[in-house]
Amino acid sequence: GAVYLYNIGNLQCPNAVLQHMSIPQFLGEGTPVVFVRKSESDYGDVVRVMTVVYIKFFVKTTKLCVDQTVWKVNDEQLVVTGGKVGNENDIFKIMKTDLVTPGGSKYVYKLLHCPSHLGCKNIAGNFKNGYPRLVTVDDDKDFIPFVFIKA
């Protein structure tokens, strides 16, 4: 399912990265994201697999929350916003998988969180406090499959 930005806990700025699922209360449209490449030598409209990227929600926001759209992983290993482009701890990569969609598409990917001082960890899904959250996991076989759609 699509990912979206949501406010859990009545914060000033929404910071939860959630996943729509095939469960009626969690169906819906996603929030568009932008992949910001770390290296200026990566140019063009295509983000290649295993390229270092920062992930940023492409959403209208208030002045107060303008810096709260970049993804990061918090101390609970949850994917949230509040990261910074250029911060070595907020790096992600996209990796191709061998999965095929029911429609036959072979363009199925997984996301990895790859802080500079540690190895990469898969992004998987988990319910936390009743919400479908994105989390980092150590198991290479546990991940959410993503299909990217140009917004």
UniProtKB/Swiss-Prot annotation:
Disulfide pattern: C13-C65, C114-C120
GO CC list: vacuole
Coiled coil ranges: none
The reply to whether Disulfide bond figures as a keyword in the UniProt entry is yes
The source's domain of life comes to Eukaryota
Listed A to Z, the keywords are:
Disulfide bond, Protease inhibitor, Thiol protease inhibitor, Vacuole
Question: Do you know which PANTHER family this protein is assigned to?
Answer: CYSTEINE PROTEASE INHIBITOR 1, KUNITZ TRYPSIN INHIBITOR 2
Which family, according to UniProt?
Belongs to the protease inhibitor I3 (leguminous Kunitz-type inhibitor) family.
Q: Which named protein is this?
A: Cysteine protease inhibitor 5
